[in-house]
């Protein structure tokens, strides 16, 4: 059993340009998380387990004037999200394989005190099974299948389902210094084209603390129920004509004693994005034309710096452009994350972490309002 509460005063989400956020009403955030896990071993080979998690969030939001559509930094509206996640799993382990049969249930509810924003309820049901088999001295293959049904339960009932089969394989060679991974997946959708995707990767240890890695993969991201069917009283709506995103990506990296540098490159065809009409201010999701390109470098360091104290730093430089070679909206070129964890006091965990978001723009091609250029600090104390 576990429980966690995050409560922060925050700052105004719509501070006028050139003004200081402290002059306006704070937009706070509260997150309550409760989780429960139970398991029973029938014998050494058979086990059943279940889990339940509740995530309840409350966010102060700043809305718009219903007549002029001007930002209202002192708006007192509240948005709430309540997620229920449940799982039931049966496991059988024998000398050949580990087999799992499972079901997952997810319910997402969204509500708001703003009369123009209707409630939303979405449900995902999943049933699946997989078998993992060790072979040779240090290789493993996993074969499985699953079924998912996605439902919109508010106002109108809309749904689609997904059936999939998949296989993944890992091989280790030369005293486990070479790790080769492969994965293949076939998805059959009720409302979208069927698709086969895959991934291959390799990691090579030069010495114990130094390794090189490379990965290549394809992806197929279908629109969510929310992106397809949501609507509000402001004129914003989902788009039932959205097409899935098709991605091709690769990355190469080097790591030494907790320090790593990774270059990544992703191409996304039919990227799903949000578009606002500049005249009516009503918006909807759409597929961007052509192929969008996201590439960049991540530099990270994670290690124990003194006894019981761990430092975590990362910097990401991102170039995100659409098919017209224009910078994509709402994506910061520079981002920096930092954190310090201390475990030296029995049963306690102390953490300080933060994130810096660099310059970004509200619309493509560096147009619209300039946002970003802010830092958020967090402090966490856990007792176990």
Residue ranges of model-derived segments:
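Gram-negative outer-membrane beta-barrel transporters
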Residues: 137-142, 172-174, 180, 267, ...
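Face-selective signature of the C-terminal outer-membrane beta-barrel domain
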Residues: 39-57, 77-205, 259-262, 310-312
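Conserved C-terminal beta-signal and adjacent last beta-strands/turns
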Residues: 2, 39-41, 131, 203, ...
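Membrane-embedded beta-barrel scaffold of Gram-negative outer-membrane proteins
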Residues: 4, 8-9, 93-112, 205-213, ...
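Surface-exposed extracellular loop regions of Gram-negative outer-membrane beta-barrel proteins
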Residues: 56-58, 65-69, 156-157, 190-251, ...
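Periplasmic-side early beta-strands and strand-to-turn transitions of outer-membrane beta-barrels
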Residues: 1-79, 359
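Membrane-embedded beta-strands of outer-membrane beta-barrel proteins
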Residues: 36, 86-88, 127-129, 165-167, ...
């Amino acid at each position: 059993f576990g429980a966690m509460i995050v409560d922060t005063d925050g700052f105004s989400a719509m501070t006028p340009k050139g003004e200081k956020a402290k002059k306006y009403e704070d937009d706070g955030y509260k997150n309550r998380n409760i989780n429960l896990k139970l398991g029973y071993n029938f014998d050494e080979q058979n086990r059943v387990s279940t889990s339940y998690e509740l995530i309840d969030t409350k966010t102060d939001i700043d809305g718009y004037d219903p007549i002029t559509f001007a930002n209202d930094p002192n708006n007192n509206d509240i948005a709430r999200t309540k997620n229920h996640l449940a799982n039931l799993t049966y496991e059988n382990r024998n000398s050949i394989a580990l087999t799992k049969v499972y079901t997952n249930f997810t319910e997402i509810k969204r509500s708001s005190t703003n009369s123009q924003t209707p409630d939303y309820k979405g449900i995902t049901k999943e049933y699946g099974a997989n078998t993992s088999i060790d072979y040779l001295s240090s290789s493993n293959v996993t074969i499985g299948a699953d079924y998912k049904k996605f439902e919109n339960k508010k106002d109108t009932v809309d749904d689609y389902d997904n059936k999939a089969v998949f296989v993944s394989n890992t091989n280790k060679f030369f005293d486990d210094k070479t790790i080769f991974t492969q994965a293949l997946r076939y998805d059959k959708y009720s409302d979208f084209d069927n698709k086969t995707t895959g991934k291959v990767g390799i990691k090579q240890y030069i010495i114990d603390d130094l390794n090189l890695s490379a990965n290549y993969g394809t992806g197929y991201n279908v629109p969510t129920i929310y992106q397809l069917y949501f609507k509000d009283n402001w004129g914003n709506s989902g788009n039932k004509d959205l097409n899935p995103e098709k991605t091709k990506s690769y990355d190469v990296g080097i790591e030494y004693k907790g320090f790593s540098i990774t270059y990544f490159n992703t191409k996304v065809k039919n990227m799903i994005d949000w578009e606002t009409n500049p005249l009516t201010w009503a918006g909807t999701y759409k597929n961007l034309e052509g192929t969008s390109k996201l590439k960049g470098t991540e530099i990270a360091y994670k290690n124990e710096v003194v006894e019981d104290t761990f430092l975590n730093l990362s910097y990401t430089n991102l170039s995100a452009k659409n098919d017209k070679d224009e910078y994509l909206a709402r994506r910061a070129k520079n981002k920096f994350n930092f954190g310090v964890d201390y475990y030296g006091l029995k049963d306690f965990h102390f953490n300080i972490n933060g994130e810096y978001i660099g310059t970004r723009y509200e619309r493509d091609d560096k147009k619209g309002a300039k946002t970003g250029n802010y830092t958020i600090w967090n402090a966490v104390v856990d007792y176990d």
